[in-house]
Each structure stands twice: as C-alpha cells, then as structure tokens.
C-alpha cells in the first residue's frame, strides 16, 4: 500500500515553508548553493545601491534599481520556498512515523527463556543484547530478534496496513520493530540496538536531517552549474570596460541583472527540491531509503534480480494432479500423499489434502488416532512425511527422494524421472512421493504467474533494463516459468553464494544491480547490490545490509522503486535542459537592452520588440523569478514517466524541455513587458 499523499500545496505546509524560506536567507545557508548564492550577493549589491541612490549618495534611476532589487530577492525566496516546501512534505511524512506509540517500560528478563523471572525497567534504558518479554497488549519496546515464541503483531502504525502479521522465532520473520503492538500470544525478544538507534529513530533522523548529503550526480551537476556561473560572471565583468570604452558605461544594476538572468538560476533554485522530493515520493510508496544516493542509483539500475515467489508468481503453489508410477493407482498415490500432508500446514500441503478429498473422497483421517509420527520438512533432507502403521511415507524434491530411496536399498524408476521432467517443463513443481523404498509417483504443484507481469517486464526491456528471475526450482521448472513470465534470464537452484556471484558478475560488466531480500542468508547479496530493498518483515541482518526498507514487505515494490528513481533523474535532467535553454531567450531580451546606448547596432537583436531597455531588463528579471514558482509543482511531482529507451526519452525531453525552454521565455518576457508598459510601470 501507499501512504496518504499530501496535497501538493497544503496550506499548513505552505505557511511553514514561507517562514523557512525567510530563514534560509542566512548567508551560511545560501552559500551551500553556489548559483543562488551569486543571486543573493547580487540582491545585496542592488539593495545597497538603491539605498545609496535614495539617499542621494549615488546617481542613477532609483525606481529601476529598487524594482530589480525586489525581484532578485524574490528569486532567492522562491528558490528557498521550493526547497522548504519539499523538506516540509518529507517532515510531514516523518511525523506519521513519529506518531508511533512508544512504551514507557519493558519487562526485562534475566534469562532468554519464557517463564523465567522478569522485572519492569524504563524502555529507554534497554541496551543491545538485553532480553525482554512482550505479551498480548504490550508495545514492543525495542528493535530486536525473536528468540522464542510466536505472536500476532499490529504494525499498522509503521506500514499503514491494518492486517496483523505473524512474528516468530527462527526463519525470515523473526525481526520486530519497536513501537509495534502485540495482539496475541507472547514473544521473547533480544534487543538489537541501543536507545536512539532504532529503525524508526534512524529513519526519522534521516528524513528530518538538517543537512541532506548530496548524491554523486547532484554534486557533478552542481559543479557544472558553478563552472557555468563562473564563466558567465567573468564574461559579465569584462563587459563593463567595453561599455566604458564606448563612452557610455553600463550601470552595476544592469550588469547584476544580466548576470542573474544568464546563469542557470532555474535548475540552481530547484535542484535541492528535486532531490528531497524524490526521497519523499519513495516514502509515499512506503519505502524508506537510507540516503538520496540509493534513490539515485535506482534510476540508473539496468539489472533487476527478482525472486520468483511473491514477485513473479503469486507464491501460493497448489496441487493440480496426481501422476502415479508404474504399478501404482492414482488413488494409492493420493492416499500416500494425503497422509504425508495431513500435518503439513504449508499452502502446498493443504492443497494436496484438498485435492485428494475432491478426487477420491479421502477424508476424516486423524493422524493421532492412527499413532502416526509427523516428520517435518528440513533444509538438510528437503523432505517431509509421516511414519504410520509400519509405513514410512515421504514427499519432497526428486533428487532428495532419490537419495532416500537409494539409502534404503530401493530403486528410483526411470518413468518417474520422465514424469518429473514433464511437470517441470510445464512450469510446475514436481513433488515425488514414496512409501518405504517404493516410489509411488509425482504430485504436480502449479504456481500462478501474476497477471500483467509479462507486460511490465516488456516495458522494462524497452528501457534497457534486464530482468533475472531468482528461484530455488530446478532448471526445467525455472525455464518454463521464465518463458511464461517473460523475464530475460533466470538463476535456478539459487543459493546465497550463487546470488552473490551473479551480482558481482554483472557489476564487473559495469552494470548496476537491484534486488530484494528478507532473510539473513540474503544479507551478503543485499550488501553487494547497488540498490538493495530489504523487507520490513525480514531479519535485522537483511535490513541492515540493504539501503532501502519496504514497509509493506512486498517484493514487487522493486519495480516501483526503479520507476521513482528514474523519474527523479529525468526530472533533474529535464529541468536542467529547460534552464539552460531559457538563457538563450533571455540573452536576446537583456543584452541588446543593456548595451543599446553604447552600441545601437545591437537593437537588431531585439527580436521581441520590447518597449524600452529598462522594461526589457526588468521583464527578464521578473520572468527569471516567476519561472521558478511555475516549475515547483513539476519539481515536486516529477516529470511524466514513460517506458521508453534512453535514446527515445532523450529525444522526447529535448523537444519538450529544450525547445520549450527556448520558446517559453520569449512569450513570457514579451507578455510581462506588455503588462509593464500598459500599467505604466516600465
């Protein structure tokens, strides 16, 4: 799910942003943005000149200088407002995390064991490694790992999802977050962090941080803009002696106005807002990025490693068919498979029981009354089953059952291998059933590929992104599902080591890799990946290894993460193109006006037919300020995103923001000039 989106111009946020914009006039804040700092200096210079002219200390047009000074200050304020509004939206979203109820005390245990003595302590005194007991109705006092027990947990304060989740010891659902509430049962939790270092504390501090670290691309663009500003500053400074030599020196006010209109103030004023808004959009999707670098990397990703279960398929495999071995009836196979599954609480196990009931009316069988012993599944044997009435029934992967049969002196039939291959080639998962040392046959399990996923992968392919399916299935099953889903490649029988090696292989080719994970065994690969989205339901190790956390624990969210990252990069590139193209039009407005008295020939460049030199310069300065205001919604929402190749996107954006950046200033400056003339302000 996504969090409730704030209105683009929320009244309360705008009031706060206006105050913050005034606070950001502090030169210590302005100097962090070199382009806008130049505008700030120009505003100070023209203000001092206006005061001197008003006092009769300096000759010049006081009204014109005051007007230029006012609009230069507006330019700085509008840029400050854009950044403050973006930051305000992020802080408002962080406040929803701040609202998570925190408990004031905790039940600290002397031993990591349920039933041992415990005593109340202040929750903020808990340290990493401490053991606590949380029971129904309690609020979990710290981030930690479940050592014992299982409970239903309400995480709605963090995720926004009202449905409770199960947290239990062992496996990939053992991580709990401080501030969530236990609804039933109990947990013994070991704290994994010290006070002030919880997941929520770190996320709130990151979102609300007074100083946001710039991303590498942002730094590179800032350096480019600074270089352009320095070049244009030097060019503007050299214009004064040229005009003086011509006998009619240009005023300092006009030179400052010329400089401000020529330097890339539009993107300079919106650059920080774009970065902050990108992280805000990520949080709006219930994904918390630990840095802007992670969001930016998501936009550059060209390889996606996607878990099959839950991302590509529904992750709820169902038994669809009983395929008996030679000499075995289908009902005999169904009988053995159902007995092996009666105590199996997995969706697959339950579906086998249901299918046997539907096909052969096998029902009302109680393992306890039969004196049966259930054999749970283990990663070592890769089988489960039951020992009942002198029968040892097992079900599991074909190679696991083969080893079991061989170890018991039996023989694995060749026709069963053919059945296994047939199910796998059809995209199903073959589950072999044995009774003693006799192979009974194969149960076909089918996982359903999510609707619309093939079309999404086709869109990613258009954008030059390679999709790789990661699965523990055998190569035949993996190949069939990969073909059905439309992924570009797959990794079958995946192990943590194989995933890590695959990521390193792609990175060695110069590619950026994104993946999701939730288990401790995913941590090495998450740490290696360029964009690593850890599931909030996963282990603490996985969350610490990733650079993003999905509060919804939805593996499909990786596709949305890439979308948001690319949108942020496209927004930055589009507005940079628009800003630089703007300067060309402003050149035709302000340069002829500035030097009309010295070099009358430059009037030929007044293609817009502006009323007077003063109105031309003032119109350009006003447009330069107002364009920042009009582009704030685009900076916050991002440019419209389409699934196109990089070359096609470049062409499209050059037409829209390049050509648009050339034409809009001509129209805008001319319109402002006409208004100034009509109102007599020029």
Curated annotation (Swiss-Prot):
Keywords: ATP-binding, Cell inner membrane, Cell membrane, Ion transport, Magnesium, Membrane, Metal-binding, Nucleotide-binding, Phosphoprotein, Potassium, Potassium transport, Translocase, Transmembrane, Transmembrane helix, Transport. It catalyses: K(+)(out) + ATP + H2O = K(+)(in) + ADP + phosphate + H(+). GO terms for molecular function: ATP binding; ATP hydrolysis activity; magnesium ion binding; P-type potassium transmembrane transporter activity. Its main location: membrane. Mg(2+) binds at residues 518, 522. The active site is at 307 (4-aspartylphosphate intermediate). It holds the Pfam family Hydrolase. It is an enzyme of class 7 (translocase). SUPFAM superfamilies: Calcium ATPase, transduction domain A, Calcium ATPase, transmembrane domain M, HAD-like. PANTHER family: POTASSIUM-TRANSPORTING ATPASE ATP-BINDING SUBUNIT (PTHR43743:SF1). Belongs to the cation transport ATPase (P-type) (TC 3.A.3) family. Type IA subfamily. Part of the high-affinity ATP-driven potassium transport (or Kdp) system, which catalyzes the hydrolysis of ATP coupled with the electrogenic transport of potassium into the cytoplasm. This subunit is responsible for energy coupling to the transport system and for the release of the potassium ions to the cytoplasm. The system is composed of three essential subunits: KdpA, KdpB and KdpC. This is Potassium-transporting ATPase ATP-binding subunit. It comes from Erwinia tasmaniensis (strain DSM 17950 / CFBP 7177 / CIP 109463 / NCPPB 4357 / Et1/99).
